[in-house]
Amino acid sequence: MINFTTNTYTLKREILNFSNKISRKLSKPNRKFTADMTYGMLASGSCLLTDVVDQLHEDSKKVNSVERLTRHLNKGIPNAALSSYLHTIRKWVPNEPVIHIDDSDIIKPDGRKFEALGLVRDGSKSTDTKNVYEKGYHVTEACVMTKSNHPVSIYSKIHSSKEKTFTSVNNVTFDAMERGKAMFGK
């Protein structure tokens, strides 16, 4: 019979080792946040903070743990963590990398109170002859293929034309291309 507890702890150790690699230059609270989010999302199979907190099994109240994670998320990704993450990924990629860049959309047709909710072309409903616009957000994602042909994200941004700092979708796409160029010098 397989010992599932041993497998669980082995998997948790591997997740925490990866988390420590990408957060070693961060402060202790940021390292804890990185470990908690990485483990919580993988263990729960969800990105909902309440589901993540359920997997952490902390002694504090659930609402307090969700607030702690929310505060860290609002700060954004520290540059040191991003740099470590991209450096780690670089080791997994072949000499001639394949980078996929995808400009997509997230549609929220019933959304009323979402922050910076703008109009986007609904790729699911639009055709060559007809464009359908819905409330939602633009999504730009860049992934690189590893040596074992697994896609790994190197750039991900959700953006809206209603944001004050928004310039154009093309600028965000070019940022994703620049990230790939800077990582691999191609």
Located regions from the model:
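Short, positively charged, Gly/Tyr-enriched micro-motifs
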Residues: 3, 25-80
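Basic, short loop/linker segments at the boundary and entry of helix-turn-helix/winged-helix-like folds
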Residues: 11-33
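Residues that form generic nucleotide/phosphate-binding pockets
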Residues: 14, 18-21, 40, 55, ...
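Long, contiguous hydrophobic alpha-helical segments, chiefly transmembrane helices and signal peptides
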Residues: 34, 38-41, 49-52, 69-72, ...
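Active-site-proximal, Lys/Arg-enriched surface segment
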Residues: 66-147
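Electropositive, glycine- and tryptophan-enriched low-complexity nucleic-acid-binding patches
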Residues: 123-185
